[in-house]
């Protein structure tokens, strides 16, 4: 077979695997869309449909790993006790980061909070249900099979910033992504993608990125009541944005478009970049060869 298809070891080149993933994903829509429509016709709301796109991406990923004669766990989904601990750790860190950002906005006079009279543990649980599926979906898409093939094919120095740009661009169509807000939101989203990418590289697992992503969104929306990436949320608290610039408060896009989010995320990226991680250095080198 011509070298354009296979490398010196006789394996299909990573670019073709990325194209295969995209092709299988597009083909899956022939089944996904009718199934989604049928479920909606039977009364399933958006809340209960949340697992459906995740199931679809998992199946596409599974098929690609089967074609490579690898287990699904090879993409960072080794569902064991260590994996669960990393998810929990990530959720705690992600929540703490968002609480720090909210506190900085509050101290700067950008927001006030009131308790929601209708608050309940059920609302927090509903938020957890929603955001766990969001985290799973976006991490599988942006830190899963495609990202890992990109690392194998080009190295992390190109794969990390490229996927960060794609992750940010994917949010450009969200509500509130306009004017100066777009600059700050794009910058912070790229930093967030770098953080999540390094979280995968330092652990060899999607557990920590999923936990970080979930904790960030859950604390931001379900707990603090901020908009999340431009989408309104009902939280335990009711935030009221005060008369301050949008670059300070994040505006209707949410705290992700705040300069404080940029500073906190940049600090987190620096810390995780300096962290040696839990993956043996030999494994990392082979991944970047």
PLM-predicted stretches and their roles:
Residues 15-19, 47, 51, 87-92, ...:
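Hydrophobic alpha-helical transmembrane segments
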Residues 5, 34-49, 70-140, 147-153, ...:
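Juxtamembrane helix-loop-helix connectors linking adjacent transmembrane helices
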Residues 98-99, 131, 135, 156-172, ...:
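Small-polar-interrupted transmembrane alpha-helices in polytopic inner-membrane proteins
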Residues 24-31, 95-99, 103-104, 164-174, ...:
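Aromatic-anchored segments of alpha-helical transmembrane domains
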Residues 1-72, 76-79, 83, 220-289:
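N-terminal, membrane-interfacial amphipathic/helix-forming hydrophobic leader that caps
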Residues 137-162, 175, 198-205:
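Membrane-interface helix/loop boundary segments of multi-pass membrane proteins
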Residues 110-117, 173-181:
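Membrane-interface helix caps and helix-loop-helix hairpins in membrane proteins
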Residues 181-246:
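Functionally important transmembrane alpha-helices
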């Amino acid at each position: 077979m011509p070298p354009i298809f296979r490398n010196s070891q006789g394996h299909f080149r990573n670019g073709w695997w990325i194209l295969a993933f995209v092709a299988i994903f597009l083909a899956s829509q022939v089944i996904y869309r009718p199934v989604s429509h049928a479920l909606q016709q039977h009364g399933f709301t958006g809340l209960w449909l949340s697992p459906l796109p995740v199931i679809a991406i998992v199946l596409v990923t599974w098929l690609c790993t089967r074609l490579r004669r690898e287990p699904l766990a090879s993409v960072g989904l080794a569902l064991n006790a260590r994996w669960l601990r990393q998810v929990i750790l990530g959720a705690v860190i992600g929540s703490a980061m968002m609480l720090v950002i909210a506190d900085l906005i509050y101290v700067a006079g950008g927001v006030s909070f009131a308790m929601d009279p209708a608050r309940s543990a059920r609302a927090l649980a509903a938020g957890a249900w929603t955001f766990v599926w969001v985290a799973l979906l976006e991490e599988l898409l942006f830190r899963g099979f495609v990202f890992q093939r990109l690392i194998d094919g080009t190295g992390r120095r190109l794969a990390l910033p490229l996927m960060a740009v794609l992750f940010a661009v994917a949010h450009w169509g969200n509500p509130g992504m306009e004017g100066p807000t777009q600059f700050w939101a794009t910058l912070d989203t790229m930093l967030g993608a770098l953080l999540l990418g390094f979280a995968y590289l330092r652990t060899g697992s999607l557990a920590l990125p999923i936990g970080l992503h979930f904790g960030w969104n859950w604390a931001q929306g379900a707990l603090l009541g901020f908009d999340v990436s431009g989408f309104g949320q009902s939280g335990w608290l009711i935030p009221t944005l005060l008369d301050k610039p949008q670059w300070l408060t994040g505006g209707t896009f949410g705290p992700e478009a705040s300069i404080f989010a940029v500073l906190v995320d940049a600090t987190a990226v620096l810390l995780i970049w300096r962290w040696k991680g839990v993956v043996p250095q030999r494994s990392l080198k082979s991944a970047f060869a």
